[in-house]
């Protein structure tokens, strides 16, 4: 606790909160263009080929984003929409691509949690 004379000398410093997704620049989503689509292996103890894309954003940043769901249609020059949200077992991946928007197709034959994967309601 500072004394009165310490407060006279200099005011209290405001604590600045560090954002977990700086490339979004305080926006909920950001548009970008895929520069590279590839697979990456997760940290120990997990094992898989996670689908990720390097994306150049309208904010000027180039970030790595995760492609959720089974199967995707993304390739270089695809226009995608990004949201925040890291992938715990992929270091450096702090963004998710939103399925079912712009050039990203929704997950085919998805029946549960459809809204998260841009899948339309089944016909039957």
From Swiss-Prot:
Residues carrying 3-methylthioaspartic acid: 89
GO cellular component, one term: small ribosomal subunit
Domain of life: Bacteria
Keywords recorded for this protein, A-Z: Methylation, Ribonucleoprotein, Ribosomal protein, RNA-binding, rRNA-binding, tRNA-binding
Subunit annotation: Part of the 30S ribosomal subunit. Contacts proteins S8 and S17. May interact with IF1 in the 30S initiation complex.
Purpose of the protein: With S4 and S5 plays an important role in translational accuracy. Interacts with and stabilizes bases of the 16S rRNA that are involved in tRNA selection in the A site and with the mRNA backbone. Located at the interface of the 30S and 50S subunits, it traverses the body of the 30S subunit contacting proteins on the other side and probably holding the rRNA structure together. The combined cluster of proteins S8, S12 and S17 appears to hold together the shoulder and platform of the 30S subunit.
HAMAP family: Ribosomal_uS12_B
Family as reported in the entry's similarity comment: Belongs to the universal ribosomal protein uS12 family.
Protein name in the entry: Small ribosomal subunit protein uS12
Species the sequence originates in: Prochlorococcus marinus (strain AS9601)
